[in-house]
């Protein structure tokens, strides 16, 4: 027997799950819905979502509505007579009219009810969590509030950053998708405990600003904001190759404690960091030592 699937998703995470469904012999994906093409980069080149590119490679029909309530969308989904609608990082809330067509299964990259919303993976790193995971759930009208079906947990290594964690959770989500569909008839959905629920918002560029107050908070921002927005000081200087040295000591915020080859050790009001790379606003990337030498900064001075 083949499961008839309609798939909704947009970014790379969702693309990998679609790839898994396409490769599975017992899954038949007949229709894909994804976000409209968007302008990307400085030149604003109109770019299709990763899910659309993959679907077209496999000859699967693609719809890109601005809203799922648009005319003809519900009818297009219904006409496929799906067994399941599978949703992963789609970017729109499903209206009840679509939720009623078939069981809608969402793959959410957190251990629900923790971190409902747009940035669960970043949030787990920001909070320095020891573990995270992926949850498959039955969708309802609320945001990530539906009954849970299955979970895979993952223990986060202390030095792991966003890209590596996202890669791990994507692999787990692919496995979980197949497991949940295949075992759906025997799974007892479990209601989420509302007293344990938390929400996470979309990341903004300003979230990456740091102030050398708390080394552990800065290090967790460095882990969570890999790629974008990164971490940067109020004057726009960006920091990379950051290591948490200690979290209990007390220093003057931003004080240069010492140099270690091409890196600089910087004190925070709580704790200390080792920084390997700096990039002043609108300037080239350079080693931390080169930055300090070029500005005549020595031990005891403020890094900025």
From Swiss-Prot:
User: Per the record, GO CC terms?
Assistant: cytosol
| Broad enzyme group | transferase
Q: Which Pfam families match?
A: Formyl_trans_C (PF02911), Formyl_trans_N (PF00551)
Q: Which InterPro entries match?
A: Fmt, Formyl_trans_C, Formyl_transf_N, Formyl_transf_N_sf, Formyl_transferase-like_C_sf, Met-tRNA-FMT_C, Met-tRNA-FMT_N
Specify the domain of life of the species encoding this protein.
Bacteria
| Annotated binding of (6S)-5,6,7,8-tetrahydrofolate, by residue | 110-113
- Its EC number is 2.1.2.9
Q: What is catalyzed by this enzyme? A: L-methionyl-tRNA(fMet) + (6R)-10-formyltetrahydrofolate = N-formyl-L-methionyl-tRNA(fMet) + (6S)-5,6,7,8-tetrahydrofolate + H(+)
Matching entries from NCBIfam families are given as: fmt (TIGR00460)
Family membership: Belongs to the Fmt family.
Any idea what job this protein has?
Answer: Attaches a formyl group to the free amino group of methionyl-tRNA(fMet). The formyl group appears to play a dual role in the initiator identity of N-formylmethionyl-tRNA by promoting its recognition by IF2 and preventing the misappropriation of this tRNA by the elongation apparatus.
Protein name listed in UniProt: Methionyl-tRNA formyltransferase
